[in-house]
């Protein structure tokens, strides 16, 4: 066989293998045996090995995985990957439908419908195709940006490496499919119940995954794509965006996704009423246990994409969609003991130790009890038969006692008076249900919890620095507070058990990477009592640096929107402590961001009093960055165009919002003109 004959054979093999892949993974209708399929793959691999210059990125041989990736690059999403608001009851679902109806009627829309789709319990990802070829795959991350995991996603059999050719007579416009018209597909990657059980059977008990979703998330974080390939992940596609599909409804886009080679799920249905939706929900709740994978409900979406744009979104979720979650599943087990944990702020939390019981695919042996008042409310005793509940990814909780089954030897749960970690007498602030250990910097449990929090995903996101490693570093005396992390030397790590050259360097790389985290994430990472992610973001917007926060009085802090007296007092007190001053000094020497990248509050108020709407794709900003620039300059950004809108910034592929702005006579500027407005304020 000469090279030209081999090239023709390779093309034919790829077509045949891709077709069999589609039949097997998307249609569940295999036409040949596994043995024959493997034989085709082997023949292809042999020919490509003989003629390596004929290997292409979309060849089926490239799914097996390649080199190890040391770190995942961060990529920004074209548009934010928002989460969905959710409900567990039909009444709230009806309220959602009523809100949609009211909003659409105010826009003169009378006829519309919805799609109902199964809600798969997995990990959301985004795929970018250029000229039909998969060029990028990324995790949802924080919604604005995520990890670029293209190599790992290429191993997922239901993700086409190259999109299938459109059917004859398709509305798909290949003329518009070019570099400026990239196509984005989003979906949920998940693992079947059978594959989940198989993976756990091969792992030590202490390393087993809690559920298929956790197993999927852990798999996608693997740095060796060959390992990912072994775990047989699946993706269901639910979102399609690109110029060729601009006029299609959501339901039509799902059909187009299937045509292009994607798996679009077990079922989706067009619904016109609450009764239609309820019928879909009931049908699949009855069928869910028979499915090969976990579902936790259904997603209801407004079908017309133009109407979706009219409704827009809040900062967290779209107004045109909602997730209906099936009722939590319950199980009965024995409360064997109650232990008390000390958190990063000194809060004492009782934790139930349970006789292990299987629930929703997980083995449950522990559950939070929140506080002592909850123990009293439930009248819990050691030895009681208790009811536990678990819904989706929520931590399991004890919701009741089977009082008639209480054994004679059941014991009451005695409240604590001293800290279980350091022995300090506990304090009980007025108007709070939580007890606290006041030994903030001397309590070993608080020190450990603060470090774990500092390294956590929503804080500094330090890869490889989990609870066990924190405990090891504390035990070796290498760290005392988060600032010490940035001065650890590799030689010190190599002297510790379980640390080799690679693991030590990986940890140091993770610590170094955390220096680039945003100012608001650093505020959250400090672990100030009552300061969660939302409050940290508010502080970062209001104050430009840690120095300005430190120097702010309690009264000035109280003047900040959404910050009341309790939070203000806690923040002001935190920065007066010598240990905090020492920590901030270390962080500054290490080169962390102790100030915001945003302009100061006295930046020119170009958009003061204005309401701005962005539409279409922006080339030089993400939506979040553009909105931030408006906010810093006194304006407000909304997602819908109305008579109150002052300005519409129109990017590429602007849709219904642009048309509505023209109809209402709202001022419209291009992205270039928006940039000119920003530049003019500084005389650039």
Curated annotation (Swiss-Prot):
Keywords: DNA damage, DNA repair, DNA replication, Ligase, Magnesium, Manganese, Metal-binding, NAD, Zinc. This is DNA ligase. Zn(2+) binds at residues 419, 422, 437, 443. Residues 602-684 form the BRCT domain. It catalyses: NAD(+) + (deoxyribonucleotide)n-3'-hydroxyl + 5'-phospho-(deoxyribonucleotide)m = (deoxyribonucleotide)n+m + AMP + beta-nicotinamide D-nucleotide. CDD domains: BRCT_DNA_ligase_like, LIGANc. It comes from the Bacteria. The active site is at 119 (n6-amp-lysine intermediate). One of its GO terms (cellular component) is cytosol. PANTHER family: CHROMOSOME TRANSMISSION FIDELITY FACTOR 18, DNA LIGASE. DNA ligase that catalyzes the formation of phosphodiester linkages between 5'-phosphoryl and 3'-hydroxyl groups in double-stranded DNA using NAD as a coenzyme and as the energy source for the reaction. It is essential for DNA replication and repair of damaged DNA. It comes from Chloroherpeton thalassium (strain ATCC 35110 / GB-78).
């Amino acid at each position: 066989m000469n090279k030209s004959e081999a090239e023709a054979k390779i093309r034919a093999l790829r077509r045949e293998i891709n077709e069999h892949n589609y039949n097997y993974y998307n249609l569940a209708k295999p036409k040949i045996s596994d043995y024959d399929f493997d034989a085709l793959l082997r023949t292809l691999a042999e020919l490509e090995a003989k003629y390596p210059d004929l290997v292409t990125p979309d060849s089926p041989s490239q799914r097996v995985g390649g080199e190890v990736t040391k770190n995942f690059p961060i990529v920004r999403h074209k548009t934010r990957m928002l989460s969905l608001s959710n409900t567990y009851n039909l009444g709230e679902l009806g309220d959602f439908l009523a809100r949609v109806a009211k909003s659409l009627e105010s826009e003169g829309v009378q006829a519309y419908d919805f799609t109902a789709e199964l809600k798969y319990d997995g990990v959301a990802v985004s795929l970018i195709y250029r000229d039909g070829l998969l060029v990028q795959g990324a995790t949802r991350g924080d919604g604005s940006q995520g990890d670029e995991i293209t190599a790992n996603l290429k191993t997922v059999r239901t993700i086409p490496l190259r999109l299938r050719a459109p059917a004859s007579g398709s509305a798909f416009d290949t003329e518009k499919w070019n570099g400026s018209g990239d196509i984005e597909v989003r979906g949920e990657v998940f693992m079947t119940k059978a594959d989940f059980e198989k993976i756990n059977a091969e792992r030590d008990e202490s390393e087993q995954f809690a559920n298929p979703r956790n197993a999927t998330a852990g798999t996608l974080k693997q740095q060796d794509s060959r390992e990912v390939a072994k775990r047989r992940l699946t993706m269901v596609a639910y979102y399609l965006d690109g110029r060729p599909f601009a006029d299609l409804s959501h339901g039509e886009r799902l059909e187009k996704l299937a045509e292009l080679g994607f798996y679009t799920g077990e079922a989706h249905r067009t619904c016109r009423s609450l009764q239609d939706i309820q019928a879909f929900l009931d049908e699949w709740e009855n069928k869910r246990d028979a499915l090969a994978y976990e579902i936790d409900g259904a997603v209801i979406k407004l079908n017309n994409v133009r109407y979706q744009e009219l409704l827009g979104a809040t900062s967290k979720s779209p107004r045109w969609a909602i997730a209906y979650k099936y009722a939590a599943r319950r199980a009965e087990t024995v409360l064997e003991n109650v232990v008390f944990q000390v958190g990063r702020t000194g809060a004492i939390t009782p934790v139930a130790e349970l006789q292990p019981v299987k629930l929703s695919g997980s083995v449950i042996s522990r559950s939070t009890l929140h506080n002592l008042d909850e123990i009293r409310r439930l009248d819990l005793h050691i030895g009681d038969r208790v009811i536990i509940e678990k819904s989706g990814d929520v931590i399991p909780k004890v919701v009741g006692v089977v009082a008639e089954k209480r054994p004679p030897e059941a014991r009451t749960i005695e409240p604590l008076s001293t800290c279980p970690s350091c022995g300090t007498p506990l304090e009980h602030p007025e108007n709070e249900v939580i007890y606290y250990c006041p030994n903030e910097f001397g309590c070993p449990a608080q020190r450990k919890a603060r470090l774990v929090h500092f390294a956590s995903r929503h804080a500094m996101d330090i890869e490889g620095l989990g609870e066990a490693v924190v405990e090891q570093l504390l035990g070796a005396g290498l760290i005392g507070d988060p600032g010490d992390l940035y001065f650890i030397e590799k030689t010190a790590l190599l002297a510790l058990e379980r640390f080799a050259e690679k693991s030590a360097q990986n940890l140091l790389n993770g610590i170094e990477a955390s220096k680039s985290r945003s100012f608001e994430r650093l505020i959250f990472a400090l672990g100030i009592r009552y300061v969660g992610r939302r409050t940290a973001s508010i502080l970062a917007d209001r104050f430009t640096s840690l120095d300005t926060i430190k120097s702010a009085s309690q009264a000035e802090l109280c003047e900040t929107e959404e910050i009341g007296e309790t939070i203000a007092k806690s923040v002001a007190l935190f920065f007066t402590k010598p240990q905090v001053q020492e920590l901030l000094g270390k962080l500054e020497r290490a080169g962390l961001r102790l100030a915001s990248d945003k302009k100061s509050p006295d930046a020119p108020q170009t958009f003061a009093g204005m309401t701005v709407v962005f539409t279409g794709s922006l080339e030089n900003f993400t939506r979040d960055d553009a909105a931030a620039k408006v906010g810093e300059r006194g304006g407000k950004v909304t997602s819908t165009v109305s008579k109150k809108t002052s300005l519409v910034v129109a990017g590429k592929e602007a849709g219904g919002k642009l048309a509505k702005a023209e109809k209402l006579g709202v001022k419209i500027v291009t992205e270039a003109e928006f940039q000119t407005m920003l530049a003019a304020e500084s005389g650039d």
